[in-house]
Amino acid sequence: LECYQMSKVVTCKPEEKFCYSDVFMPFRNHVYTSGCSSYCRDGTGEKCCTTDRCNGARGG
């Protein structure tokens, strides 16, 4: 499963590849944000982190 990193997506933790401040892409970028498993700090403030979805994930 291949994961895409968009401009607003930040990886704060190696094990949690999807950290974001406010991202939802209803386009082909395939960045899905369906909840936070944790939060992390990144200079600008807190980011929501999840491992739920990667590019190509089906449903939901």
Curated annotation (Swiss-Prot):
GO terms for molecular function: toxin activity. InterPro entries: Snake_toxin-like_sf (IPR045860), Toxin_cobra-type (IPR054131). Expressed by the venom gland. Its main location: secreted. Belongs to the three-finger toxin family. Short-chain subfamily. Orphan group XX sub-subfamily. It is found in: Secreted. Disulfide bonds join 3-19, 12-36, 40-48, 49-54. This is Weak toxin CM-3. The lineage of its organism: Eukaryota, Metazoa, Chordata, Craniata, Vertebrata. The keyword Transmembrane does not apply. GO terms for cellular component: extracellular region. Keywords: Disulfide bond, Secreted, Toxin. It holds the Pfam family Toxin_cobra-type.
